[in-house]
């Protein structure tokens, strides 16, 4: 486990480049900062400034090396590296509320933006007119779209929203891609087709994620539940009411294992038994370390004033938390190995820090932990 504190401000979202040498983060404002690893330090190398409102989503396309950002100014920008400068291209989303999340499709020919306008904007590049255009998925979304994730085929799109639903839509754009092959979620996939809709959640759906082969989708809700739908089992949904505070992010690390994190400030493991069709709690992944009590240095006292509005000792300042992160974890991303066999994953949080977790090290450190 490696932890780096970038900022005093919260990190609202992040994205990695292809070779994981650079990370783009938003310091909870209208800017995006790109850091590069230099020895044991992270050095800021670029600053992207174009949004007028807070940046709410970042995604970095690995092959085309383009960054897409969205924000509360209701716009998205596609950033292209020309020389040593990132150049933005405005994408008109045709929404009247804040954009909340953005994701490149795996084929990188389009991206999806969820918003408070109760629509999902599917944006693609029109070569003839040399601009980005978008189509809207509207029905039956009834509230803000908080999270998105693409199926590996770049056609199906999972969306979690504030109407307590996780849905899967077809985002097939005939102008830029071939007709999709049938999937376990369905064979007819015209644009905007609803392929799946959950009914088991009772809270805002904060995070959603497809498995590596796309036959399973998992989501976490504000009622502290974790759910998984299996298309190979007639879209049967397994639901687990966790004992944690609400989870904000989730990702598959194998076909049957999930890592989620949120307001408890540490990642937790969930496993899925396909034979029984059940989810189970696999354990906490952040091992608490026993540390001796000591006084605060002047530097720590001022950091606590900035981060936690407290200058008191460890218990009052949140330093008494035995987790690596000292505030809510807002995002999880797979670093290496992919969703099928993840070997490393990354978390960023409201404490302004970033942690890199090694799956094998976690397994050896936690005797009862088994990742299947």
From Swiss-Prot:
WD repeat start-end pairs: 6-45, 50-89, 94-135, 140-179, 242-280, 324-367
Alphabetical UniProt keywords: Actin-binding, Cytoplasm, Cytoskeleton, Nucleus, Repeat, WD repeat
BP GO terms, sorted: Arp2/3 complex-mediated actin nucleation
Gene3D superfamilies, per the entry: YVTN repeat-like/Quinoprotein amine dehydrogenase (2.130.10.10)
GO annotations of cellular component type: Arp2/3 protein complex; cytosol; nucleus
Record carries keyword DNA-binding: no
Keyword Amino-acid biosynthesis: no
One Pfam family here: WD40
Subcellular localization: Cytoplasm, Cytoskeleton; Nucleus
GO molecular function, one term: actin filament binding
InterPro entries per the UniProt record, alphabetical: ARPC1, WD40/YVTN_repeat-like_dom_sf, WD40_repeat_dom_sf, WD40_rpt
PANTHER family, per database record: ACTIN-RELATED PROTEIN 2/3 COMPLEX SUBUNIT 1 (PTHR10709), ACTIN-RELATED PROTEIN 2_3 COMPLEX SUBUNIT 1B (PTHR10709:SF10)
Subunit description: Component of the Arp2/3 complex composed of ACTR2/ARP2, ACTR3/ARP3, ARPC1B/p41-ARC, ARPC2/p34-ARC, ARPC3/p21-ARC, ARPC4/p20-ARC and ARPC5/p16-ARC.
Family: Belongs to the WD repeat ARPC1 family.
Primary role: Component of the Arp2/3 complex, a multiprotein complex that mediates actin polymerization upon stimulation by nucleation-promoting factor (NPF). The Arp2/3 complex mediates the formation of branched actin networks in the cytoplasm, providing the force for cell motility. In addition to its role in the cytoplasmic cytoskeleton, the Arp2/3 complex also promotes actin polymerization in the nucleus, thereby regulating gene transcription and repair of damaged DNA.
Protein's name in the database: Actin-related protein 2/3 complex subunit 1B
Originating organism: Bos taurus
Lineage, uppermost ranks: Eukaryota, Metazoa, Chordata, Craniata, Vertebrata
Gene of this entry: ARPC1B
